């Protein structure tokens, strides 16, 4: 009789542990999903900031000629920095 009760207690504890593990796994997926969303949002913000910066290449022109070149290439032109100003020359 005692052995049967111990077996039932262990089976009950095992079932509770299994249910608990499954619910925690669900929460884990939820947390990982939230982390993934935050990473995607951060990537999108960085990409938008980079695009905004390259679209305003005249601000970066004295430091990096490449910004002017990329800005004008998007307009299908050739870019050149002259005295803090990005000049786009159509081909």
UniProtKB/Swiss-Prot annotation:
Q: Name one GO biological process term.
A: killing of cells of another organism
Keyword Protein transport found: no
Signal peptide residues are 1-25
* Keyword Secreted on entry: yes
Look up the coiled coil feature and give its residue ranges: none
Could you state a single Gene Ontology molecular function term?
potassium channel regulator activity
Q: Where is the BetaSPN-type CS-alpha/beta domain?
A: 58-91
Matches recorded under Pfam families: Scorpion_toxin_alpha-beta (PF14866)
Cystine bridges: which residues?
Answer: 61-81, 68-86, 72-88
Q: Which UniProt keywords apply?
A: Cytolysis, Disulfide bond, Ion channel impairing toxin, Neurotoxin, Potassium channel impairing toxin, Secreted, Signal, Toxin, Voltage-gated potassium channel impairing toxin
In which tissues is this gene expressed? Expressed by the venom gland.
Subcellular compartments: Secreted
Q: One GO cellular component term, please give it.
A: extracellular region
Which family is this sequence assigned to? Belongs to the long chain scorpion toxin family. Class 2 subfamily.
In its miscellaneous comment, the UniProt entry states:
The fragments 26-37, 34-42 and 43-52 described in PubMed:18718845 correspond to the propeptide and some additional residues of the chain. The authors do not know if these fragments are the result of the post-translational maturation process, or if they have a biological activity of their own.
**Name of the protein:** Tityustoxin-19
